[in-house]
């Protein structure tokens, strides 16, 4: 949408300066193979569908009432699945909202917060929105996070693990180094993709009072369309997030989303089976692309980050699109020769590989 300078006179000065986040494309064209936004290729648990239908058909009358502002049933389900106390759980309308509350609750400090120069691009957006001071820490030449860079004075630390878009994960020992180096600052580990092979820092919660772990149901639980995210931390940090949330939106999660997410957490067998299917497919996709001459960074996510020495990444993305396949291309320094490719089903991945082999490379 184009807005004229004259029309912008109604805007707050701060809003005129904002550079908003640009989400991955959600194409309106049918029959495209969508490998650009890291959505799960498999549906949610059948129990999720049953739970949503139950709300619609068996409890329809309650839709006139506000949902539980605390989403108690959901917090209890998460706490049980993670083996923690319910007081250590915070929930929100997707992990993006949870992250926004984290920035407001913890990151308005005199010193800058630290995060990688190549990471989730919502972090600089939140920083600008809230007026957070920041310092971007360059990844090393192998696109890895060097935790020694996060021992300098700061106002907090936020790290995506596995990192996005690079897909590389830190070990728990490395995360502990960051926590121990910053005992008086909040360290946030954003684990949107952790269920695809990385180690979760949730196991460290009771040992570190400065740790917040953020997760989502969008990726590994196939609920991107319902927007449910959560944070896990000691109760004194959760209290800060609740204070922010109740100063912004007391009812962030609707009844359908609560019911669906609860059902997802209660079906651990299905969850683990689908995660393993993605992991197995990812490893085969990496092998197949390597044969075609791609260099693929080591992935612990449901996507891969790949480059080809003989082909321009931007042109590859365009040629794939012409063949009905969408991948994510970032025209940014250091990564403008990489493609981020969501792991699909084996059939979808095979179509990608065959298209590259027969029609593009």
Curated annotation (Swiss-Prot):
Its cofactor is pyridoxal 5'-phosphate. Signal peptide: none annotated. The keyword ATP-binding does not apply. GO terms for molecular function: histidinol-phosphate transaminase activity; pyridoxal phosphate binding. Its EC number is 2.6.1.9. The modification N6-(pyridoxal phosphate)lysine is found at residue 219. CDD domains: AAT_like. Keywords: Amino-acid biosynthesis, Aminotransferase, Histidine biosynthesis, Pyridoxal phosphate, Transferase. It holds the Pfam family Aminotran_1_2. GO terms for biological process: L-histidine biosynthetic process. The keyword Nucleotide-binding does not apply. Gene3D superfamilies: Aspartate Aminotransferase, domain 1, Type I PLP-dependent aspartate aminotransferase-like (Major domain). InterPro entries: Aminotransferase_I/II_large, HisP_aminotrans, HistidinolP_aminotransfase, PyrdxlP-dep_Trfase, PyrdxlP-dep_Trfase_major, PyrdxlP-dep_Trfase_small. Homodimer. This is Histidinol-phosphate aminotransferase. The lineage of its organism: Bacteria, Pseudomonadati, Pseudomonadota, Gammaproteobacteria, Moraxellales.
């Amino acid at each position: 949408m184009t807005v004229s300078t004259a029309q912008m006179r109604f805007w707050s000065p701060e809003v005129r300066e904002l550079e908003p986040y640009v989400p991955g494309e959600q194409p309106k064209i049918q029959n495209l193979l969508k490998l650009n936004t890291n959505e799960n290729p498999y549906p949610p648990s059948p129990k999720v569908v049953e739970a949503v239908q139950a709300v619609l058909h068996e409890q329809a009358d309650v839709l006139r009432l506000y949902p539980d502002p605390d989403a108690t049933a959901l917090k209890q389900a998460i706490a049980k699945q993670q083996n923690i106390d319910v007081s250590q759980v915070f929930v929100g309308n997707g992990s993006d909202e949870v992250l926004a509350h984290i920035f407001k609750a913890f990151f308005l400090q005199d010193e800058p917060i630290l995060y990688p120069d190549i990471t989730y691009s919502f972090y600089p957006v939140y920083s600008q929105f809230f007026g957070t001071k920041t310092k971007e820490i360059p990844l090393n030449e192998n696109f890895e996070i060097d935790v020694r860079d996060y021992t300098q004075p700061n106002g907090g630390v936020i790290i995506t693990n596995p990192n996005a878009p690079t897909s590389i994960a830190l070990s728990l020992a490395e995360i502990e180094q960051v926590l121990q180096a910053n005992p008086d600052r909040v360290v946030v580990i954003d684990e949107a993709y952790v269920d695809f092979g990385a180690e979760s820092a949730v196991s460290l919660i009771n040992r570190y009072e400065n740790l917040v772990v953020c997760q989502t149901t969008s990726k590994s639980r196939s609920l991107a369309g319902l927007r449910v995210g959560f944070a896990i931390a000691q109760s004194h940090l959760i209290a800060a997030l609740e204070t922010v949330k109740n100063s912004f939106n007391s009812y962030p999660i609707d009844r359908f989303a609560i019911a669906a997410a609860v059902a997802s957490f209660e079906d651990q067998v299905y969850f683990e089976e689908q995660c393993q299917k993605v992991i197995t497919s990812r490893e085969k996709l990496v092998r197949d692309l390597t044969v075609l001459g791609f260099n693929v960074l080591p992935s612990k996510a449901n996507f891969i980050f790949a480059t080809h020495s003989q082909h321009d990444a931007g042109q590859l993305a365009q040629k794939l699109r012409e063949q009905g396949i969408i991948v994510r291309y970032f025209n940014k320094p250091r990564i403008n020769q990489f493609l981020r490719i969501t792991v699909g089903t084996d059939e979808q991945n095979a179509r990608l590989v065959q298209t590259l082999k027969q029609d593009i490379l």
